[in-house]
Amino acid sequence: MNKRSLRVLEFNKVKEMLKKYAYSSSAKKLVDELVPYDNTYEINNRLEESNEALEILMKKGNPPIEGLCDIGDILQRAKKGGTLTPEQLLKVLGMLTATRRMQEFFKREDQEVSFPKLEDLAYILAPINDLEKEIERSILSEDEVSDNASTTLYNIRRSLKEKNSSVREKINSIVRSNSKYLQDSLYTIRGDRYVIPVKAEYKSSVPGLVHDQSSTGATLFIEPMGLVNLNNEIKELMLKEKAEIDRVLSALSLKVKMNAEHCESNFKILTNLDFIFSKGKYACELNAIKPMVRDDGIFNIMSGRHPLIEKDKVVPLDVVLGDEFDTLMITGPNTGGKTVTLKTVGLLHIMALSGLLIPASSNSSVSFFKEVFADIGDEQSIEQSLSTFSSHLTNIVNIMEYDNRQSLILFDELGGGTDPAEGAALAIAIIENLSSKGAKLIATTHYSELKAYALNKERVENASVEFDINTLRPTYRLLIGVPGKSNAFEISKRIGLGKEVIDCAKNYMSKENLEFEGLIRNLQEKSIIAKKDARDAKVIKDEADNLKKKYEQKLERLEKVKDKAYMDAREEAKKIVANAKDEADEILKAMRELEKLGIGSGGRQRLEEERKKLKDSLEEKEKNLYKMKENDGEVLEKVALGMEAFLPSLNQTVVVISMPDNRGEVQVEAGIMKISVKLKDLRKTKQSKVEKVKKKRELKLHFSKVENRIDLRGLDAEEACYRVDKYLDDAYMGNLGEVTIVHGKGTGILRKAINDMLKRHVHVKNYRLGGYGEGGDGATIVELK
């Protein structure tokens, strides 16, 4: 896309705002390089990533990107065999830690909402835990290696501490015994060796090696001979320490080199995630949405807001183009918001085509344009010089030379800066030329000729910015279908210009112009009233919709509570009966034991009578659990798929979804529940034969429409399993032998959830992953019973 439009529409300022939300310098660099994409596939992918980032930020908070630094040069140094400094290794550690934490951040439970785009990115991350732990253990700060880096280093430093302690004890003794020869009763260090400050005149009184002297020459820093050997030992240990540190750093650098490819890949993915989340954070700040992207030149921006205008000052605008008209002519007074409208439309398109969410309402759409041209001056002046006219015309000529079949062109004061009649004629000619090439245009103007042109020309529409005559201020609302007027007479009257002067001015205007201006004013007033009525109606409708939704949800919750309470009561009753049966069996068992111990045949017969009486009583109690509230109805002897029946135990009508098995049980559907019951427990309904036949025909027709393939991509596991369960029931009743379930490859979570459900499903005979030409690992082939 041309750089001039990006500059004029202030896309660079948007990117500067976006950079504030990027953590790493590498992500900020991606922001600097951001330009509109050249195909809808890329645009939709980038918009979906931004939208997922926004949703994640709202649900889970900020991702763990802290500590990520640009390590490109560091990895190149390691790959060439160079030794990394502790500071460089800490930067590598920051990336490794961010890699591990980011992957943990994206882990979720099966029931949680999925974010496939970003989860796929995080899935590619390859944590290098061993290297992370080793650097963390070895490097203490940007300039210090830890004692724990190696056993050798630990031992060397322990010896150093011991030697230093011995030297300090000895030198303190020397200071005390030679205090009269010393400048101060203390010791110091010169060149890593312990020395004492001796007065120059007593140099011969303290035998030792001179290492330094004061600036005046009055003090000599002498290493006493008694310390030379100890100082030599300390120096040797310090050299060993340095050598061991170099070895540790070299070993760590080698391990970084060995893992350089994984580090580079992780760094690239983390940078991309940092960039994507910066877009999500900016969208959160703007209260932005993901627009639909069309490729037919039609767009509908609803409540669009300019992202660079302060929230409390920006006025939302509605702009449509490409459906009923291809050119929009905006007229109205200066400072009325015409130029802001142009810039808002252009900038929101550039943002969306660059993968950024836009500040607008959720039902907004943009269109894919290969080019967005903007001829917008930096200054809005009443007087325009010839040089300004020439500059605008030069830019227009460049625009007209381009193939504008997929272009959005924005003109500010088209034809301005020259004679009004010539300027208007030139503007009309330019519009017609560009329209004939398929371009979509929005232009602002003051010329009445262009208002009349828009009224009479097909595919061209007038628009104006609303102006409040009472306050003499623009409202900045865009009124499509209504041409604007300058309001010069009304403004002059409000300011205090005499009536006679205004009347005189009107006499110089033609009758046609006065009538035209009056017509425009009437249209504006009616449009304003209509807009207000529409806004009021929308508020009432939204309130009604919310109220309806609220009570529907409340009713649904009540139904669920009622069903659950009923089922809980039945389960509790069944448990009571079962416990009673168990207790009876225990009693009978005990009675048989007593019989073995000596009860005669007469007692045996009585025991059997009591046993039968107890069993009969329990069975009667169990039957009472399943009695209907009203008449039980006639017992069903035969059933058919799709037949309605009455189930007394639930006191409701159910639908038969399977034929009786070898145990005499059928599966029925009761609302959202599927349960197995005995055929003898079902009762005929009071439905007429005609209604039954009609129902069967409707059912058969419904099942005949069942397709042999269902696509679940984009759904979460819970929703997907629900749809598959219902789909398999329909497919089974539609006599489909084999069906295909498309779940995509992704992270494999959805496929696992589907497979777990298929293992338990009553209609599934067998299932397998798709083969070549069947969708591969992204699909599962299911054979039905």
Swiss-Prot record:
<dbReference type="InterPro" id="IPR007696">
    <property type="entry name" value="DNA_mismatch_repair_MutS_core"/>
</dbReference>
<keyword id="KW-0378">Hydrolase</keyword>
<dbReference type="InterPro" id="IPR036063">
    <property type="entry name" value="Smr_dom_sf"/>
</dbReference>
<dbReference type="GO" id="GO:0005524">
    <property type="term" value="F:ATP binding"/>
</dbReference>
<dbReference type="Pfam" id="PF01713">
    <property type="entry name" value="Smr"/>
</dbReference>
<dbReference type="Pfam" id="PF20297">
    <property type="entry name" value="MSSS"/>
</dbReference>
<comment type="function">
    <text>Endonuclease that is involved in the suppression of homologous recombination and thus may have a key role in the control of bacterial genetic diversity.</text>
</comment>
<dbReference type="InterPro" id="IPR046893">
    <property type="entry name" value="MSSS"/>
</dbReference>
<keyword id="KW-0255">Endonuclease</keyword>
<dbReference type="GO" id="GO:0030983">
    <property type="term" value="F:mismatched DNA binding"/>
</dbReference>
<comment type="function">
    <text>Acts as a ribosome collision sensor, splitting the ribosome into its 2 subunits. Detects stalled/collided 70S ribosomes which it binds and splits by an ATP-hydrolysis driven conformational change. Acts upstream of the ribosome quality control system (RQC), a ribosome-associated complex that mediates the extraction of incompletely synthesized nascent chains from stalled ribosomes and their subsequent degradation. Probably generates substrates for RQC.</text>
</comment>
<keyword id="KW-0699">rRNA-binding</keyword>
<feature type="binding site">
    <location>
        <begin position="332"/>
        <end position="339"/>
    </location>
    <ligand>
        <name>ATP</name>
    </ligand>
</feature>
<keyword id="KW-0238">DNA-binding</keyword>
<dbReference type="InterPro" id="IPR027417">
    <property type="entry name" value="P-loop_NTPase"/>
</dbReference>
<dbReference type="GO" id="GO:0045910">
    <property type="term" value="P:negative regulation of DNA recombination"/>
</dbReference>
<dbReference type="GO" id="GO:0043023">
    <property type="term" value="F:ribosomal large subunit binding"/>
</dbReference>
<protein>
    <recommendedName>
        <fullName>Endonuclease MutS2</fullName>
        <ecNumber>3.1.-.-</ecNumber>
        <ecNumber>3.6.4.-</ecNumber>
    </recommendedName>
</protein>
<dbReference type="GO" id="GO:0019843">
    <property type="term" value="F:rRNA binding"/>
</dbReference>
<feature type="domain" description="Smr">
    <location>
        <begin position="710"/>
        <end position="785"/>
    </location>
</feature>
<dbReference type="InterPro" id="IPR000432">
    <property type="entry name" value="DNA_mismatch_repair_MutS_C"/>
</dbReference>
<dbReference type="GO" id="GO:0004519">
    <property type="term" value="F:endonuclease activity"/>
</dbReference>
<comment type="subunit">
    <text>Homodimer. Binds to stalled ribosomes, contacting rRNA.</text>
</comment>
<dbReference type="InterPro" id="IPR005747">
    <property type="entry name" value="MutS2"/>
</dbReference>
<keyword id="KW-0547">Nucleotide-binding</keyword>
<dbReference type="InterPro" id="IPR002625">
    <property type="entry name" value="Smr_dom"/>
</dbReference>
<keyword id="KW-0694">RNA-binding</keyword>
<dbReference type="InterPro" id="IPR036187">
    <property type="entry name" value="DNA_mismatch_repair_MutS_sf"/>
</dbReference>
<keyword id="KW-0540">Nuclease</keyword>
<dbReference type="InterPro" id="IPR045076">
    <property type="entry name" value="MutS"/>
</dbReference>
<dbReference type="GO" id="GO:0016887">
    <property type="term" value="F:ATP hydrolysis activity"/>
</dbReference>
<dbReference type="Pfam" id="PF00488">
    <property type="entry name" value="MutS_V"/>
</dbReference>
<dbReference type="GO" id="GO:0072344">
    <property type="term" value="P:rescue of stalled ribosome"/>
</dbReference>
<dbReference type="GO" id="GO:0140664">
    <property type="term" value="F:ATP-dependent DNA damage sensor activity"/>
</dbReference>
<comment type="similarity">
    <text>Belongs to the DNA mismatch repair MutS family. MutS2 subfamily.</text>
</comment>
<dbReference type="GO" id="GO:0006298">
    <property type="term" value="P:mismatch repair"/>
</dbReference>
<keyword id="KW-0067">ATP-binding</keyword>
